[in-house]
């Protein structure tokens, strides 16, 4: 059968939360839920993860931070597994220009590049970082500088949460922007 895995998190976005994985070894007929991090303070909880499979049992995940403080603790989380999701490491990255904004990863197995898309809330900038997967795997502080892709709304809660996908050799990103109640979905293709 096909092995399937998905990450989960649970929180009320107030004080604490947990995260983990659900797995299936029978093509999704049955699932097993496992907690990896439990009762973590909200500032230490990786939420809304985006994962890519790098091959050879390696899974790379970037997750958002709920920490709004302008400190080194306000950075995206990098979760990694080298054994098909059995065990995990969790560390903060050097990506601190972001909070409460869902990331989106794309992995290009032909080039070995991983693309980390995210929206910088408050400043209103859609950003992307490009790294060789081998350079950041095991090295969460090694992400290169970001590139600004597009500008959007600056109200922190009315703009953000990018989703990106690779299509026909291009990357297409979608995010919401505006000022409530006048928000819209925007796209960029690179």
Residues covered by each model-derived region:
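Asp-box/BNR beta-propeller blade signature and adjacent active/binding-site loops
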Residues: 1-190
């Amino acid at each position: 059968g096909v092995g399937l895995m998905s990450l989960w998190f649970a929180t009320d976005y107030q004080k604490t939360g947990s995260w983990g994985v659900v797995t299936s070894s029978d093509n999704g007929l049955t699932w097993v839920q496992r907690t990896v991090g439990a009762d973590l303070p909200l500032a230490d909880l990786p939420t809304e993860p985006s994962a890519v499979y790098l091959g050879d049992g390696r899974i790379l995940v970037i997750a958002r931070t709920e920490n709004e403080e302008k400190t080194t603790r306000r950075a995206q989380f990098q979760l990694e597994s080298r054994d098909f999701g059995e065990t995990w490491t969790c560390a903060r990255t050097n990506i601190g220009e972001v909070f409460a904004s869902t990331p989106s990863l794309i992995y290009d197995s032909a080039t070995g590049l991983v693309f980390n898309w995210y929206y910088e809330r408050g400043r209103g900038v859609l950003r992307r970082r490009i790294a060789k997967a081998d350079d950041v795997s095991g090295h969460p502080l090694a992400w290169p500088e970001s590139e600004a892709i597009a500008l959007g709304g600056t109200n922190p809660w009315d703009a953000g949460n990018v989703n990106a996908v690779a299509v026909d050799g291009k990357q297409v990103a979608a995010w919401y922007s505006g000022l409530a109640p006048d928000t819209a979905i925007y796209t960029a293709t690179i």
